[in-house]
């Protein structure tokens, strides 16, 4: 049976969580299971409390066997120019064909509902190990648009002082960004991401120009408070690259998940190969060390140069996530 799911059912979900096949925060293997479930329940509660929330639960023999939760994405919607939302949570208690069927039914119910609301683009991101969710999304018409590898650096296992970094270019300077730097960083974005291979570029139905504009607005949002610190790299007193970093998110802080995030970096194509990306990473790591035990950085599966650099300097791959998009006719 498929039924609507609301915040009032949070206690039922709390009891059901141990039966689900999903592993929250799978890229952080040091966390114990209770810490993971507390974090997951916190996230679920926030999603259900969102006024845009649409959620359904599958119940069999009086027990929850799966659920799906959707939230609008207002920032994405504004940039894309289409109402966009995300399948924030998609979980099932069985990883076999029965689980796929349960999830497919939940997705079908959800898509009918968001279609009536006027949602045009729906996105979903799932761990690469969640095969039931992947197959259910594919059967429901979702298109795979990218895969991100979750890289993690553990300060307790690899002291940053023991890492051998290459000698820096004598003309290179790393500093904190200020508001006057924004135009230069936007220019670097347009050069770096015009032919990128991320999910916005991979989606053939994404409106023209949207893919690059997403990254431009991302850096603009960083200056408006989304990022906790922005570093810029200068060569010969000219900005040639940047990196965006965030401290632990609120939900991570509440559940004692001691992480910092290296979310985005870009180097002017003319300045690549001179060690800017490595220098930005190192200086950001020194800052993050004061308040985080772990660093997390998502890297596109096809971005081999960055993968090689991270592994060279002590980062390791701890997980992978697939991104899916689907479009509904207006």
Language-model segment annotations:
Residues 41-117, 126-129, 155, 241-269:
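Conserved donor-binding loop and adjoining core beta-sheet/short helix segment
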Residues 232, 239-298:
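Glycine/small-residue-rich hydrophobic helix-like segments
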């Amino acid at each position: 049976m498929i039924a609507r799911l609301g915040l009032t059912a949070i206690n039922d979900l709390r009891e059901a969580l141990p039966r689900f096949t999903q592993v929250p925060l799978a890229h952080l293997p040091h966390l114990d299971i209770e810490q993971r479930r507390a974090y997951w329940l916190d996230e679920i509660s926030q999603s259900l409390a969102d006024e845009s929330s649409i959620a359904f639960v599958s119940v069999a023999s009086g027990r929850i066997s799966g659920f799906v939760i959707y939230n609008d994405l207002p920032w994405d919607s504004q940039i894309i120019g289409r109402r966009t939302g995300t399948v924030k949570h998609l979980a099932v208690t069985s990883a076999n064909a029965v689980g796929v069927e349960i999830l497919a039914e939940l997705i079908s119910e959800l898509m009918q509902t968001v279609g009536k609301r006027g949602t045009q683009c729906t996105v979903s991101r799932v761990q690469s190990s969640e095969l039931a969710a992947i197959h259910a999304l594919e059967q429901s018409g979702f298109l795979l648009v990218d895969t991100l590898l979750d890289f993690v650096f553990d300060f307790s296992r690899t002291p940053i002082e023991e890492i051998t970094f290459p000698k820096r270019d004598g003309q290179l300077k790393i500093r904190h960004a200020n508001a006057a730097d924004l135009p230069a960083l936007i220019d670097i974005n347009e050069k770096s991401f015009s032919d990128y291979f991320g999910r916005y570029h991979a989606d053939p139905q994404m409106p023209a120009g949207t893919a690059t504009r997403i990254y431009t607005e991302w850096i603009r949002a960083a200056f408006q408070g989304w990022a906790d610190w922005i570093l810029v790299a200068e060569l010969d007193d000219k900005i040639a690259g940047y990196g965006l970093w965030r401290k632990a998110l609120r939900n991570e802080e509440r559940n004692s998940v001691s992480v910092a995030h290296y979310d985005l970096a870009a180097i002017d194509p003319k300045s690549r190969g001179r060690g800017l990306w490595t220098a930005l990473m190192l200086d950001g790591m020194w800052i993050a060390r004061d308040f985080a035990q772990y660093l997390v950085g998502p890297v596109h599966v096809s971005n081999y140069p960055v993968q090689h650099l991270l592994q060279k300097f002590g980062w390791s791959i701890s997980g992978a996530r697939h991104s899916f998009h689907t479009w509904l006719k207006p």
